[in-house]
């Protein structure tokens, strides 16, 4: 685990923004395929049709459950924004877990100050152990001096939320 994978999202904010823009564009293209009548929203029947055309034997109850999960505003349709949000929610959890693995060099399920500092230095961010300890202190909910997967996810998602404001 000495290399930092290029697709883990742990690069600079600028490269992450480019990846996000590309994936939103790709999701728009997929959305257009689901939106058979071009009205800017996906209905339950459009979802069922596309899933069946892809070989999935989905029943009405499954389609209804999928629609309920995706339809955040409860209008009975999935808008482009709801579609993007749904897809990014699943991807971001996976991406965050992959990013966590990059930092968790000894694979023990937590990130120490030394691991944090080493990983930051490996991507060109100057760092001291003291700085790493301060970062950890700010997100360490249970006070063990380490960052758990949950604490890492909280830290990263609150950073993303702060940057979008």
UniProtKB/Swiss-Prot annotation:
Record's PROSITE patterns? EF_HAND_1, EF_HAND_2
Q: Which Pfam families match?
A: EF-hand_7
Q: Which CDD domains match?
A: EFh
Q: Where does Ca(2+) 2 bind?
A: 71, 73, 75, 77, 82
In which residues is Ca(2+) 1 bound?
A: 35, 37, 39, 41, 46
List positions binding Ca(2+) 4.
140, 142, 144, 151
Domain EF-hand, residue spans: 22-57, 58-86, 91-126, 127-162
For this UniProt record, the keywords arranged alphabetically read as follows:
Allergen, Calcium, Metal-binding, Repeat
Annotated Ca(2+) 3 binding lies at 104, 106, 108, 110, 115
Q: Which domain of life is it from?
A: Eukaryota
Gene3D superfamilies in the record: EF-hand
Listed GO MF terms: calcium ion binding
Q: What is the protein's given name?
A: Polcalcin Jun o 2
Q: Which organism is it from?
A: Juniperus oxycedrus (Prickly juniper)
